[in-house]
């Protein structure tokens, strides 16, 4: 075949793909992962939390395991005399019930092994995040692999390693050069050795787990990616770093109060509205020989902040709309294989706060308030619906999350009075559908689904957004 023929075929393929509606290029197998650390850690609320999450149709749980929480003498500057690869030397009691509860329900578990770390496991032993020792981390991962074994479906290394509360230093003091990416690379390689030594040589391990935006103290996610993979600003290899072989790339694509369609000006930031930036960066890194081609993306932590957060919080109605829109954006990207919901209940307020801003400085991204009161997003989560205006049309995307196969679902609309039926359609085998309707000013939409037991379930009413 001549050199021109593949180019013609590739061009034809691109034209054909471009002609498809956006959702037609969606991931063929996108899963939803839930994270509810407070509710699942508390024995008094654990069973109820598991049952409620299960009622949504979710079958995957993310747990962040902090090394310092299980290690002996974590606050000591001097390492205790023990075999760090022996799982019996650690206290796993904070995490075992969560893992076992998920496994008993047939769920998949993503375990993120992260800092902060034991003080004795850092260079200089001055705190719990500065330059963790790769050799010590390897030993800990070996112990974790031996303890949990195949109960864990996927592992991930470090939570937000581009954030100073989890890893230091982020930058050099003199030239403000990013340092955390190379520190992290060594920790990831140490973890791979640890899994092999712990009897899991074929463990599915995700890399990165980066937060979405950079600052003077936080390394931007794409800057972090390039540094971790030994690439310059143009994605050319620097030095002799070997190719890494993670099972996927993990990222936390949080957005701002502007909503999921927000596009940050900083080109190295990656929020949900510009997830294509991460796809492009991964493809360029693959062409440079730094990672495998077509690495799948796992959006392992996500949520929409609501009131009473006074900085990033949106109204309760917008929280429901924005979360559904964000899930649609993830669904539309064929490289995104996993999306997530962070929190069942909001974080509790800070009792020692001296201002309203400090009082709600945690996460208000839950489906319920911190007291357990249902938010509108609790109703929309099992039946998300996102409506985009496209000229004279409205593109409706929805999901019956609890569905176990193709199922009928009805779209209803209101213009301020009662609800009327717009149409009934049948979802695909995973519960998704996409359908167009004529735009009518003032209309709002919701999903209505009849469960197998005969119950009629209504989703939250959503507005139409211009993409």
Language model features with spans:
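Substrate-binding cleft and catalytic face of glycoside hydrolase catalytic domains
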Residues: 56-218, 254-256
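Conserved, mostly hydrophobic/aromatic
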Residues: 34, 61, 102, 144, ...
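Bacterial N-terminal signal peptides
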Residues: 8-19
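Noncatalytic carbohydrate-binding groove/subsite architecture in carbohydrate-active enzymes
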Residues: 43-47, 51, 134, 138, ...
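Boundary/entry segment of secreted carbohydrate-active catalytic domains
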Residues: 26-66
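Short strand-edge motifs at loop-to-beta-strand transitions and within beta-strands
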Residues: 431-435
């Amino acid at each position: 075949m001549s050199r021109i023929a593949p180019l013609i075929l590739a061009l034809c393929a691109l034209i054909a793909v471009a002609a498809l509606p956006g959702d037609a290029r969606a991931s063929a197998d996108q899963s939803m992962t839930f994270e509810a650390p407070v509710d699942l850690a508390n024995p008094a609320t654990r069973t109820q939390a598991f049952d409620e999450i299960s009622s949504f149709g979710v079958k995957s749980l993310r747990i962040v395991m902090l090394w310092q929480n299980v290690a002996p003498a974590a606050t000591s500057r001097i390492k205790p005399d023990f075999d760090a690869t022996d799982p019996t030397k650690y206290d796993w009691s904070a995490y075992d019930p969560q893992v076992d509860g998920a496994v008993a329900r047939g769920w998949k578990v993503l375990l993120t092994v992260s800092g902060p770390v034991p003080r004795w496991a850092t260079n200089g032993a001055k705190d719990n995040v500065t330059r963790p020792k790769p050799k010590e981390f390897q030993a800990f991962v070996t112990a974790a692999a031996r303890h949990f074994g195949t109960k864990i479906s996927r592992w991930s290394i470090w939570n937000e390693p581009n954030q100073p509360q989890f890893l230091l230093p982020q930058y050099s003091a003199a030239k403000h050069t990013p340092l955390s990416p190379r520190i992290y690379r060594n920790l990831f390689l140490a973890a791979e050795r640890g899994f092999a030594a712990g009897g899991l040589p074929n463990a599915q391990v995700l890399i990165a787990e980066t937060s979405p935006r950079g600052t003077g103290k936080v390394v931007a996610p794409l800057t972090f990616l390039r540094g971790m993979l030994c690439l310059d600003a143009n994605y050319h290899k620097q030095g002799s770093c070997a190719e890494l072989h993670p099972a996927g790339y993990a990222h936390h694509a949080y957005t701002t109060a502007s909503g999921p369609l927000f596009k940050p000006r900083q080109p190295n930031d990656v929020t949900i509205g510009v997830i294509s930036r991460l796809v492009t960066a991964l493809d360029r890194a693959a062409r440079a020989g730094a990672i495998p081609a077509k690495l799948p993306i796992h959006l392992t932590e996500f949520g929409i902040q609501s009131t009473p957060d006074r900085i990033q919080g949106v109204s309760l109605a917008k929280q429901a709309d924005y979360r559904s829109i964000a899930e649609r954006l993830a669904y539309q990207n064929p490289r995104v294989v996993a999306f997530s919901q962070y929190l069942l209940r909001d974080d509790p307020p800070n009792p020692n706060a001296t201002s309203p801003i400090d009082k709600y400085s945690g996460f208000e991204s839950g489906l319920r308030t911190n007291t357990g009161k249902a938010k509108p997003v609790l109703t929309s989560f099992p039946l998300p619906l996102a409506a985009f205006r496209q000229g004279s049309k409205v593109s409706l995307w929805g999901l019956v999350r609890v569905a176990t196969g193709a199922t009928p679902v009805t779209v209803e609309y209101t213009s301020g009075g009662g609800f009327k039926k717009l149409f009934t359609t049948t979802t695909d085998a995973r519960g998704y559908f996409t359908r167009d309707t004529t735009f009518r000013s003032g209309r709002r939409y919701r999903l209505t689904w009849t469960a197998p037991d005969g119950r009629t379930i209504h989703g939250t009413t959503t507005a139409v957004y211009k993409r």
